[in-house]
């Protein structure tokens, strides 16, 4: 059996370890992106969100990184259009151009 090194190194990371707030008020875009970048640099893994409301603008998923929204977790898109990035007038909450082995899963909700 052949298992890739990335699969062996994949780890779960609690969003709160990166200073990501679940209060529904704090704009978490930079903290979430830093978490994704960190997990990517470590070879991949899953960023796990637990009960709460997580306000964010656009974040870019990277290869081998996934997001898990557990039951009661809500990823809330900020109402400000200026907090979103995109090309050619297209803006999105989660951007993943050219990335592999990514995903968003769980029983939580994406609002926005």
Enumerate the predicted regions with their spans.
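Extracellular/periplasmic carbohydrate-active domains that bind, remodel
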Residues: 1-112
């Amino acid at each position: 059996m052949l298992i890739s090194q990335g699969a062996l190194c994949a780890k779960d990371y609690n969003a709160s370890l990166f200073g990501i707030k679940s209060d529904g008020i704090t704009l978490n875009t930079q903290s979430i992106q830093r978490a994704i970048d960190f997990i990517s640099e470590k070879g991949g893994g899953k960023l796990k969100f637990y009960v709460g409301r997580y306000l964010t603008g656009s974040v870019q998923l990277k290869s081998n990184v996934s997001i898990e929204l557990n039951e009661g977790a809500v990823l809330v898109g900020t109402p400000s259009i200026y907090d979103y990035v995109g090309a050619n007038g297209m803006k999105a909450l989660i951007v993943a151009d050219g990335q592999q082995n990514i995903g968003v899963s769980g029983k939580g909700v994406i609002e926005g």
